[in-house]
């Protein structure tokens, strides 16, 4: 019995140290990764080098669980010599995922947000607003499961002839309870 208790204690300590958030379905609780990844892009020609950053979050409120990805970006140079079209396509796919203890992630809901016009029209965007938030449909919260947000970004740079590039981003910390 003592070995089982110590093993449970050790496992719990590792989980808590790993950044797990505990939730109550009645209270609003969020679990966001400080940074879920970024993409530094050097464009052809005189378009400004830019950094695109992402943050995945999972949220529980009023018995529902939601996942979203925020995207911000900035120029890495002082002046943009060419403000022309930078992308033929820029899409973020956000997934709400669940897992049982010791299991693997299962996608519950997913959505793809087309941000092509927004990233082409704005050389930078640092605000966290609904326009740059890709929100997957919510699901009924089950406190016996672990929940997370995961995402990927797919983009096609105008004029580089490389086609669509897809990058998997780091998921949010797990939310449980």
Where do the model's predicted regions map?
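Secretory targeting and sorting signals
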Residues: 1-28
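Post-signal peptide N-terminal regions of Sec-secreted extracellular proteins
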Residues: 27-177
């Amino acid at each position: 019995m003592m070995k089982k208790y110590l093993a449970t204690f050790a496992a719990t300590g590792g989980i808590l140290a790993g950044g797990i958030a505990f939730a109550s379905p009645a209270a609003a609780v969020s679990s966001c990764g400080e940074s879920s990844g970024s993409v530094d892009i050097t464009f052809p020609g005189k378009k400004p080098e830019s950094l695109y950053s992402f943050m995945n979050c999972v949220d529980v409120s009023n018995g529902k669980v939601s996942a979203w990805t925020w995207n911000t970006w900035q120029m890495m140079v002082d002046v943009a010599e060419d403000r022309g079209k930078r992308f033929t396509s820029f899409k973020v796919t956000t997934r709400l995922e669940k897992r049982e203890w010791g299991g693997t992630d299962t996608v519950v809901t997913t959505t793809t947000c087309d941000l092509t016009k927004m990233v082409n029209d704005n050389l930078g965007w640092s605000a966290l607003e609904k326009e740059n938030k890709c929100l997957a449909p919510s699901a009924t919260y089950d406190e016996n499961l672990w929940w997370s947000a995961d995402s990927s970004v797919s983009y096609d740079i105008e004029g580089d002839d490389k086609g669509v590039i897809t990058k998997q981003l780091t998921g949010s910390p797990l939310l449980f309870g």
